[in-house]
């Protein structure tokens, strides 16, 4: 069974309310994301998980599969965890609804990894940080990687004395996250860690490696 994709969506974005319905070339931003996902060679099933009827009504004319969820979720991971209870699946890729430039090639690479890896329970796509200025941008999440495993995620790092010595170990999180279904449901039940609250990144829970 190929992994499915779920795009969590809500209108009450803290930094940019209603962002995912922003019109881009005649389509809502999130519809661009959905169509980018459908360009993948391996993903057949794409769902939008939302609590907002406005999102549902905006996307249904395009043929989107909508799963309505509770409005009590504080992050996309818990929203997707509720949605997967209504779907027969084994592995789920979570795609952010504000990534209209998502590369299908990245999604293909992650999907192939999931299909060939039956030991891991969670995956997170990362990319290189090309220059030191990127390291200090607060607009995206960074992570430290040891032996191909993420051990810490953060937005604002401490100052590094020598960027060249660290750039192979510090990478940017690309917004493609995947889970085994059972693990995702259990993960959503865990309480938020203090660092998760500080960094505003929902996949930092109890030092679980990804």
Walk through the language-model features, giving the residues of each.
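Short glycine-enriched, charge-decorated loop/helix-capping segments at active-site entrances
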Residues: 20-24, 67-69, 192-193
């Amino acid at each position: 069974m190929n992994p499915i994709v779920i795009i969590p969506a809500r209108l009450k974005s803290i930094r940019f309310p209603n962002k995912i319905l922003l019109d881009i070339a005649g389509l809502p931003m999130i519809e661009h994301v959905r169509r980018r996902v459908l360009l993948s060679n391996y993903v057949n099933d794409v769902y939008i998980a939302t609590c907002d009827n406005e999102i549902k009504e905006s996307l249904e004319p395009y043929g989107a599969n909508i799963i309505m969820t509770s409005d009590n979720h504080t992050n996309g991971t818990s929203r997707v965890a509720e949605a997967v209870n209504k779907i027969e699946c084994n592995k789920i890729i979570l795609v952010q609804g504000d990534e209209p430039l998502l590369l299908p090639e990245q999604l293909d690479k992650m999907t192939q990894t999931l299909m060939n890896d039956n030991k891991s329970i969670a995956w997170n796509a990362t990319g290189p940080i090309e220059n030191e200025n990127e390291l200090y941008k607060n607009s995206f999440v960074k992570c430290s990687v040891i032996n191909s495993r993420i051990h810490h995620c953060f937005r604002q790092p401490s100052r590094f004395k020598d960027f060249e010595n660290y750039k192979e170990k510090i990478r940017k999180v690309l917004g493609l996250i995947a889970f085994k279904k059972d693990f995702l449901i259990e993960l959503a039940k865990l309480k938020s860690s203090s660092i998760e609250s500080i960094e505003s990144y929902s996949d930092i829970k109890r030092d679980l490696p990804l």
